[in-house]
Amino acid sequence: MRVLLGTLWLTLACSSVHATLSKSDAKKAASKTLQEKTQVSGKPAQERGLVVTDLRAEDVVLEHRSYCSAKAHRKHFAGDVLGYITPWNRHGYDVAKIFGGKFTHVAPVWLQLRRHGREMFEVTGLDDVDQGWLRAVRKQAKGLRIVPRLRFEDWTYEDFDSVLDNEDEIEELSRTVVQVAKSQHFDGLVVEVWNQLLVQKHAGLIHLLTHMAEALHQARLLVFLVIPPAVAPGTNKLGMFTNTEFEQLAPVLDGFSLMTYDYSTAQPAGPNAPLPWVRACVQVLDPKSKWRSKILLGLNFYGMDYSASKDAREPIIGARYIQTLKDHRPQVVWDSQAAEHFFEYKKSRGGRHVVFYPTLKSLQERLELAQELGVGLSIWELGQGLDYFYDLL
């Protein structure tokens, strides 16, 4: 494992943006408004010659809405595919209906688990639950499982300390969660809690999750766990969730949503999920390939816009990405080491920016890696991507 991490560090040490575009490229403005197709296509993107490294901004703008309607419900990827949906990017709800057959699980980001005192738990966020949408999605895609994300919200260290060592607390917590999932007609839950606790409490958290899983399984419900990357971004060190924890929970849980994105920090600008790092995260987590089918490799359908003048970054999603391509018509560059595209542009007052955003080619590379490693996919999130991305799934 040390050899693997050391090799990864050497590979990625120089993976921040080192390619520089010429001033003429950076200043190039669109001579005319870039066109967008509004009709769907009879062929998927991969049959239209769009999965390429030599990408042009005008081609992305032209084709991004044009997905293959004939194969919109046909799944190509062999493993499980979980897609997150957030209420603040409502296009994700439409994506789940249009492309529902391409997913095995959909996880709306709806629910929070709160503790109000001894053996007093409440699941909030139920106002966001749309039963009409649930029925519509299930009608469109038979067999699709709805597993909303449940995040432990506003828990103090004292809350965790009280619950993790108390069987009555754990039993009441589990009962509350199961009751809500059953009453709302969910198929299970995606639990997000691991990042909130220090390493010293991980044994207690494993005990809690094991008990929760038993209760959910008794009610014929699924349970997934959101986990951080097994290799800390930008380092050759192990992350907060390693093979040790994975081996204890893999027999108990139905799957793990692995957060293999957000690799680069504010400066220097760099890739969202360099391919060698993504590979290492899976191999370190499960080196013997014993439970690979339960790992859902994280795919970001958002990008990052890095500002050199502000020494900062901010997320960029599909609509703004397309508008940036229209406004600046940049030269798009392929980073072969990270297997990601990026481009530079300059604001009149905001200085130089660098944008990394997923493309058909970068996604195809990760789908092929997932197939090779024998893992599934978890997409954050469906409302942030471009419609023709789903041709690949």
Swiss-Prot record:
InterPro entries: Chitinase_II/V-like_cat, Chitinase_insertion_sf, Glyco_hydro18_cat, Glycoside_hydrolase_SF
Signal peptide span: 1-19
Superkingdom in the source lineage: Eukaryota
Keyword entries, A-Z: Immunity, Innate immunity, Lysosome, Secreted, Signal
UniProt cross-references to SMART domains, sorted A to Z: Glyco_18
Record's function text: Saccharide- and LPS-binding protein with possible roles in pathogen sensing and endotoxin neutralization. Ligand-binding specificity relates to the length of the oligosaccharides, with preference for chitotetraose (in vitro).
Protein name, as recorded: Chitinase domain-containing protein 1
Biological source species: Bos taurus
